A protein has these predicted regions:
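Bacterial N-terminal signal peptides that target proteins for export
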Residues: 1-8
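Repetitive helical segments and hydrophobic/amphipathic motifs
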Residues: 11-14
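N-terminal signal peptide c-region/cleavage motif recognized by signal peptidases
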Residues: 16-18
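N-terminal alpha-helical modules
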Residues: 20-138
Length: 138
């Protein structure tokens, strides 16, 4: 019966996961092995993405308020929310394509995830700044 063998493989994999998922000291990323640098770059992108996701509802609320105000006198201009959503979707496509292109120079290598995640983190931070700027200009 293959079930005990499959369970043994799953148990073996489960034992190796904690070692692979160790906490790397990202403050000293230059002295980490490639796997650690890749992990730190991914974590950096995730932090940037969480910041963007925290800013997003604030900008959406502000845009909805602007649309409500515009609808009273200029209903044809009450399209801020739709425009914001369209722009964000286009930006995600741009970010993913740009970062894949940057990483493509390192296809097949262990450096590719590092380059792609650095790129995603940088572009995501920039986009978050752009979104927050919209709150100041409103």
């Amino acid at each position: 019966m293959k079930t005990p063998k499959a369970l043994a493989v799953v148990a073996l994999v489960a034992l190796t996961v904690p070692a692979a998922a160790q906490d790397w000291d990202c403050d000293d990323a230059g002295n980490l092995p490639q796997q650690g640098m890749n992990w730190c770059a991914y974590q950096d992108w995730q932090r940037a993405d969480r910041a963007l996701n925290a800013a997003w509802p604030l900008v959406v609320d502000a845009m909805n308020a602007a649309d409500a105000f515009a609808a009273e006198s200029f209903p044809e201009q009450a399209n801020g929310h739709d425009s914001l959503l369209k722009a964000q979707r286009a930006w995600i496509t741009y970010r993913d394509g740009q970062c894949t292109a940057e990483g493509a120079r390192f296809a097949g290598g262990s450096l590719r995830p590092l380059i792609e995640n650095f790129c995603k983190a940088a572009l995501t931070r920039k986009r978050t700044e752009e979104l927050l700027l919209m709150l100041e200009e409103g």
